[in-house]
Amino acid sequence: MSTASPPSSPDPLNRASIPPGWGDTIVLLGRILIGGIFVQSGFDKLMGLDAFAAGLAARGLPAALVPVLAPIGASGEFFGGLAIVFGLMTRCAALLMITFVIVATLISHRFWVFQAAERRAQTVHFAKNVAIIGGFLFLFVTGGGRYCLDRWWCSNK
């Protein structure tokens, strides 16, 4: 009869290497950094909705869809970014932002239609957006951490 205890499952976040209390602070900082850029960019689009719509039309979106997609895209970017920053419905917000970034990337950074230097620049933007999607995937898995409205919301029901 073996007295050895079963191996414990590995901690996928390797929390043992993070000082106590820092993990949630780092998640908060990450949320502010990744969400903040979308808040700022979405706000700019909302304040200049006509220019944003013109840019979408110039990228080849059907003219009938532009008046619908421009406010939806700008609002989704702004409010999705706010939800990430404040940790409100973090996992849902992360999925919303993944969808937003995929659509925005396929509309604005189609590197395969460009030549030479512009192709290289658009490839960098495309790859950057793929990395941002990776950040949102992490938020989807980890949630908002201790310092988020999700935690307050769930504890007050």
Regions found by a protein language model. Give the residues of each.
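Perimembrane loop-to-helix junctions flanking transmembrane segments
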Residues: A53-A64
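Extended, low-polarity transmembrane helix blocks
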Residues: M1-D50, A64-S75, F79, F86-K157
